[in-house]
From Swiss-Prot:
Keywords: Membrane, Transmembrane, Transmembrane helix. Its main location: membrane. Residues 324-362 form the UBA domain. InterPro entries: Peptidase_S54_rhomboid_dom, Rhomboid-like_sf, UBA, UBA-like_sf. It is found in: Membrane. This is Rhomboid domain-containing protein 3. The chain crosses the membrane at residues 20-40, 58-78, 92-112, 141-161, 163-183. One of its GO terms (molecular function) is serine-type endopeptidase activity. GO terms for biological process: liver development; MAPK cascade; negative regulation of natural killer cell activation; positive regulation of protein catabolic process; regulation of acute inflammatory response; regulation of protein secretion; response to xenobiotic stimulus. It is a multi-pass membrane protein. GO terms for cellular component: membrane. It comes from Homo sapiens (Human). It comes from the Eukaryota.
Amino acid sequence: MHARGPHGQLSPALPLASSVLMLLMSTLWLVGAGPGLVLAPELLLDPWQVHRLLTHALGHTALPGLLLSLLLLPTVGWQQECHLGTLRFLHASALLALASGLLAVLLAGLGLSSAAGSCGYMPVHLAMLAGEGHRPRRPRGALPPWLSPWLLLALTPLLSSEPPFLQLLCGLLAGLAYAAGAFRWLEPSERRLQVLQEGVLCRTLAGCWPLRLLATPGSLAELPVTHPAGVRPPIPGPPYVASPDLWSHWEDSALPPPSLRPVQPTWEGSSEAGLDWAGASFSPGTPMWAALDEQMLQEGIQASLLDGPAQEPQSAPWLSKSSVSSLRLQQLERMGFPTEQAVVALAATGRVEGAVSLLVGGQVGTETLVTHGKGGPAHSEGPGPP
């Protein structure tokens, strides 16, 4: 697993949130804290025990359940955290753990006592898989993404006695509600995530090793980095290339379309300074949306430069006779100068002497259209005689 460093380099690092969850669950198991985190509805009447609605996901009382939860975190949780970012992954995990716990307590209050009374992280795994698997995306391979949580729901009771089946089902239902947008009003805004990531703590964790906070896709930390012409790497990588891992293991889509393959601008007249942005390369770990957005932007710029319509010839300039003094214009006309050229010369100098100097020197052309009023060239007199 690779994470992007503070200057864009890649270094081997593990996703922070899912790795810390593994350490925390293992530590709680070793110290025997699992029974103290059981989701017991009768204990929730005590205000100091309400934390069980959330912390029940961290405790385990059976070793097979702990091993299954730990196995799914590196195989599924790491990919989810890379796709969502550390902050959004933590928010989604906590939200789904709370939702599944509330649903289990509700079912227990309705008489289904087996829906609660246990603990474990498997309901959160099922909720995260269900929430991601039901998003609109083309399935890849023989196993559709939406089928994975249902298969896991059927296999988990065969591998471990905790949590009970109804509690697992509550996690799956919470994930389906999450995918349907039931918790959208609880989602943090992009601005809020950006403010958090720019804080001192998040910036410090983003540069740590071997555990690293991953930036949320769409934030400034995910934008491509350009270098000035003098300090760019000598051999920049091809632009717009998304990570093969994200294509194959998480996006569950077909091979990238031809439009996402590396394209180099080839139009004429482009200088090195004008193409500094073209040297930005996407490193492994870049999400698909970033490569797609950058590719669409580059192709739009290239198409506008290559296939843009030819500029229409500029229309001839026009000048109104009312913009100059009629008395001075009459003086020039009595001297024998054409009216159109006299108007232009007077407009340029404002004085008869200066206008005569321009006209005698032949410095006034015949391209300007002169109008009688303040309108456009529709009332033009046309150029005067040579």
